Regions:
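Bacterial N-terminal signal peptides that target proteins for export
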Residues: 1-12
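Electrostatic cytochrome c docking/interface patches
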Residues: 24-47, 58-69, 244, 248-253
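Gly/Gly-Pro-rich "capping" loops immediately C-terminal to redox-active cysteine motifs
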Residues: 35-36, 61-182, 187-191, 200-225
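The canonical Cys-X-X-Cys-His
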Residues: 49-60, 236
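Juxtamembrane interface at the cytosolic side of transmembrane helices
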Residues: 251-255, 262-289
Length: 289
């Protein structure tokens, strides 16, 4: 039995070591410390991904309008609620408020009277629809750089043949990269390019040796403090983590609610237990034997 255990242990250890070697974990990975609930970080990550990565990489499992709904809709709804409160309490309306009200009625709103009239004609569900439409429009304007529509999957427009000629390989689809490589890997990889004149693009990478991707973030790195640059890379990594599993947003949120429920249930059960045991303690209750 003992021998069997030792053999199993050494086989497992051997496997772990070889998997680690395969995964190239001889490089110390930095902790990404991303937080999928941080919506500002995800928004910045989405913008940076579209600006710096989408020219080469697709994330074909993701559609633009899903990003709109998951990452930007909340802000648009929030702005509308604020504008509506200001409108109903007769506070002065800012340009942002007018924009938010225009979003809600799906028409350009120019004055208070018009805002009140237009809103009065719409049901809540119509307003919801309009706000979602406005979010799609915003995403189409800021994140879609090619002729794609907001309902399309996010596909890079780089021709496959060209990519192979330029890089020796096609840039991989990044839909699931956070799940296959992990966030720490991506975070470290993007910050590990170094100058190497023997390589076609003049750079190499500590995590992915002889990499065929250029250091696309070098300009960003030079124009910012290290702290801000690291935050930008963290945001891109966070965004890729979200792309790998969009349902995580719902799951994490649900997890907190379940824990909250269990906590309340714990208090109630404890009080109930005390109530039952009080009778036992004071001898009012005796088991029938
Ligand atoms: C100019 C084209 C180009 C751009 C722009 C680009 N990449 Fe790449 N990327 C590549 C190529 C080519 C590879 C394959 C590298 C290799 O295997 O040697 C790659 C590989 C990767 C990998 C490794 C994937 C894997 O599974 O091995 C990740 C992660 C990655 N890129 C992320 C990014 C991110 C994030 C951005 C934007 C900040 C970006 N890339 C911008 C061309 C590009």
């Amino acid at each position: 039995m003992k021998k069997l255990l030792t053999t199993t242990a050494s086989v497992l250890a051997g496997l772990t070591i070889s998997f680690n070697l395969l995964a190239g974990s001889n490089v110390q990975l930095d902790r990404a410390n991303t937080d999928i609930r941080d919506q500002k970080s995800l928004q910045n990550g989405a913008q940076l991904f579209m600006d710096y990565c989408s020219g080469c990489h697709s994330i074909s499992f993701m559609r633009y309008n899903r990003i709109a709904e998951d990452l930007f809709l909340d802000d648009i709804v929030e702005a509308y609620k604020q504008a509506k409160t200001n409108l109903l309490t007769n506070k002065p309306l800012s340009a942002t408020d007018f924009q938010a009200l225009s979003n809600a009625v799906d028409n350009s709103v120019k004055n208070i009277k018009q805002a009140k009239e237009s809103l009065g004609k719409l049901s809540d569900s119509q307003i919801e629809k309009n706000l979602s439409k406005a979010t799609d429009r915003m995403v189409e304007k800021n994140l879609v750089f090619n002729a794609d529509k907001v309902g399309s999957p996010i596909i890079s427009s780089m021709p496959k043949k060209g990519a192979e000629a330029w890089f020796g390989t096609t840039p991989p689809d990044l839909s699931l990269v956070a799940r296959s490589k992990g966030t720490d890997w991506i975070y470290t990889y993007l910050r590990s390019f170094y100058k190497d004149d023997s390589r076609p693009f003049g750079v190499n990478n500590k995590v992915l040796t002889n990499v065929s991707m250029p250091d696309v973030l070098w300009h960003l790195k030079e124009s910012k403090s290290t702290k801000d640059f690291n935050q930008d890379v963290r945001d891109i990594t966070n965004f890729l983590d979200y792309v790998g599993e969009p349902a995580k947003l719902v799951r994490v949120d649900l997890g907190y609610k379940v824990l909250g429920f269990l906590f309340i249930l714990f208090i109630l059960s404890y009080l109930l237990k005390k109530e039952y045991w009080r009778d036992v303690k004071y001898g009012k209750w005796k088991a029938k034997d």
